[in-house]
Amino acid sequence: MRNVLLGILKSYSHKAILQARSQLSLTQAQMADRLSMDTRSYVYLEHGETCCSTLTLALFLIYCCPDPVKFLKELRTAFQTTRKAAA
């Protein structure tokens, strides 16, 4: 179950990060700077090749996400739906 939830987080955060960068009109390097990571690591994250760390997720929610509450509510719904389906 943990790997399934991690996959949901990876997919959901990847889409939200792409959308936020577009809304903020930032380059990949600028977005990486806001998330305190190097550009190469950010590119991997943006392409969904890696999952964000707890620190990266927190920085994203604080400095980049246009609506952190909405992000977390939708992520919670996705997690709950997955858990119910597995039960």
Question: Could you tell me what each predicted segment is?
Answer:
Residues 25-44:
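Short alpha-helical DNA-recognition segment
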Residues 11-12, 50-52:
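Short acidic alpha-helix initiation/capping motifs at coil-to-helix transition points
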Residues 53-73:
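DNA major-groove recognition helix of helix-turn-helix/homeodomain DNA-binding modules
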Residues 1-23:
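A short, Lys/Arg-rich alpha-helix, primarily the initiator
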Residues 15-31, 59, 84-85:
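Short basic helix-loop element that most often maps to the first helix and adjoining turn
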Residues 5-7, 44, 51, 69-87:
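Short, charged recognition helix plus adjacent turn
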